[in-house]
Every structure is written in structure tokens, then in C-alpha cells.
Amino acid sequence: MATVVTFLVVIVGWIFSLCLHEFSHALVAYYGGDTSVRDKGYLTFNPLKYTHPVYSILLPMIFLLLGGIGLPGGAVYIETWRLRSKRWESAVSLAGPAANLVLAVVLAIVLHFAPVSASGVWPGLAFLGLLQIMAMVLNLVPLPPFDGYRVVAPFLNPEVRGRIDQASNIIMLVVFFLLWYVQVVNNIFWSVVEWIAVQLGIPLSLAVMGLTQFQFWRR
């Protein structure tokens, strides 16, 4: 029963966090001048409005189910030419990872004051908090197609930016390959994630328990 509860908590919570991530992009874009996000339904918090069949569903679920890694995967199309400045464009990109951090902090506070136990809810929430940190760290990588790149991209030479954007898909595959198969890169990634989790007060032992219960098919 605990396994089922954990699985549902993580899946539902992860979908909510994807919506929050993309909603945050859209909200900042709206205040930055791109009112088209309202017409596109991005301010409704409707999961269907943020859906891309590959980036929103397929890749995130594969990474989550096979590797327990929180891959951010929404799809909000911002009309950047409407934004008031390059700084607003950077702020829009930062809004998503910031939302993941805020949710991680909220979950850490809940876990701190709640009667934490090994039942399905609490390990699920702890693992969900860890997923938020993973998503934030991964999304801040300053390479396309991650938000970290979108933060600095407005200030790049247009020709340089164009060439980098053309190689976006290849760069993404290289990043995932390094993260998955190169031990040094994997260790650095997890060290950063764990350090942030400890600073926020997310119990790592409970999060690991949540991961184990979530991936029940590996037992």
C-alpha cells in the first residue's frame, strides 16, 4: 500500500511541478510584455496547455521511471520580441527553476513540521522535493535547450546564438550522455543536488526511501 501511495504522490506531484514551472515562465513573460501567453492559455494552470508529446511527456517519464531523475519537460512558447528588454527575457527563463526551488522549500518545511514516517506519503514528498532540486540544477546548465542557456542567450552575438541554437538537440543528447554514463559528471551532479537538499532540510534517507518505493518494479 505504501508503494502505491508513494507512486501516486510522486506522479501527481511531478505533474503539478511541471505546471508550476511553465506557469512561472508564462507569468513573468506576461508582466514582461508578452500578453500572448494569456491568449494561449498558459496562465490557466491547465496541464494540457503545457504539453509537448516528447519534451513534456515521453522524455520526463522515461527519465523519472528508469533513472529517478527529475527532467523538466514543459512547453511554453514565449514571443520574446514582445518582451520589454533582454533582462526580461532572462527573467522569464529564470522563473521556471525558481519555481522548482520554491516548491522544494515548501516541501522541506512540510517535512520539517509533519509527523514524518515511513508511510507512503512522506517518502513520496521527500523524493518529490529531491526531484525539484534535480530539475532546478539540470535546468540551470548554461547549454541549450535548458533555461540556464536562455538566461545568457539574449546577450550573445546573434550569429553565435544562431549556431548554438542549431546544435541544440545534439548538445542536449551530449549532456544526457555525460550525466548518465560519465561517472565524474554524475558524481558532480548528485553532489550538488544532495548539498542543496541538505541545506534546505530535505531528509535524504527519506528521499531515498521514496525513490525505492516509487521504483517498485526494481525490487
Regions found by a protein language model. Name each.
Residues 1-219:
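Hydrophobic transmembrane alpha-helices and their immediate loop junctions
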